């Protein structure tokens, strides 16, 4: 089983994450940040990665540390669950529409973290959620998951739709990238022999 559990405890947050890369997209995410939970649920459902996430943060300040630290812990869990990465597709991409929004995500599970973020969320808030935290989450996920991650907004006028399209596009790209190709199940997907 390609599974992992990660706990992260700081003066600002307490996070626990468990993932199953060979799951069916079941989820139980409770971070105390409603819109963020909704996005994490989409990430799980559309990647088919089972996720259970618990987070407690310094909400009296804002949601920044909770969102960022969840991205850190989830990235670390993905690295653990992937192990030596033998047999994985490694690459994934998705061009995803959601009403007015269209977002493209392309990623490489290369152990070379990098985020390209070409997304313009037109409002500062989605409900009470700070829209700048969408990028913060993906930056933390890419950095600590060793992911080269490109997210590009093609269209969109509604912040909720754009953000949700981004999470779903990344989810679909992850789904492809973590899948094992039986034709190369014992090989690392690199001519270097390691990732």
UniProtKB/Swiss-Prot annotation:
SUPFAM superfamilies: Ribosomal protein S5 domain 2-like. It is found in: Cytoplasm. GO terms for biological process: L-histidine biosynthetic process. Transmembrane segments: none annotated. The keyword Cytoplasm applies. One of its GO terms (cellular component) is cytoplasm. Pathway: Amino-acid biosynthesis; L-histidine biosynthesis; L-histidine from 5-phospho-alpha-D-ribose 1-diphosphate: step 6/9. Keywords: Amino-acid biosynthesis, Cytoplasm, Histidine biosynthesis, Lyase. It catalyses: D-erythro-1-(imidazol-4-yl)glycerol 3-phosphate = 3-(imidazol-4-yl)-2-oxopropyl phosphate + H2O. The keyword tRNA processing does not apply. Its EC number is 4.2.1.19. It is an enzyme of class 4 (lyase). Pfam families: IGPD. One of its GO terms (molecular function) is imidazoleglycerol-phosphate dehydratase activity. HAMAP family: HisB (MF_00076). Belongs to the imidazoleglycerol-phosphate dehydratase family. This is Imidazoleglycerol-phosphate dehydratase. It comes from Ruegeria sp. (strain TM1040) (Silicibacter sp.). The gene is hisB.
